[in-house]
Amino acid sequence: TNALTGVAGAYLESTPMFVVSGQVKRADMINGQGLRQQGMQELDIISVVKSITKYAALVDDPQMIRYHIERALYEATHGRKGPVWLDIPLDVQATMIDEDRLIGFTPKPEMKNTHLEKQVLAVIDELNRAERPVLLAGNGIRLAGANKEFDELVETLGIPVLTEEE
């Protein structure tokens, strides 16, 4: 739980972050028994962090560790970047695994936005109808490596730009 503030900040700032937490043994987990806690310092941290992470998983099957690590790394660093969290029970941490039998993660091909042209035209229409348009520019421009394209857009539009506070 001590990492929550940092994770929330990473989520809001689109910063990759990889958190690994320990959990009580699987046998000591409440697993829907209607209790708040059964094991020593047990907390369903995944439920707590789901809304401030791109990916959060309880690794309850030792043979799935490779999958979860690879997926978490992928999610943290692709698309809009952000934090990920893996929670690993003590008995899973101590389990011997056969590296050759570990299941990996294969990302799905990125989907193209088939409505992008329509969306851009709608934005242009809104800008043309606006009495006092302003462009709000955030850190996503820098993260996407689109500084040059953004500068060209600003020059083309000729409207005021407001940037976020750093």
Where are the language model's segments positioned?
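N-terminal alpha/beta PP-like core and its mobile active-site loop of ThDP/TPP-dependent enzymes
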Residues: 1-166
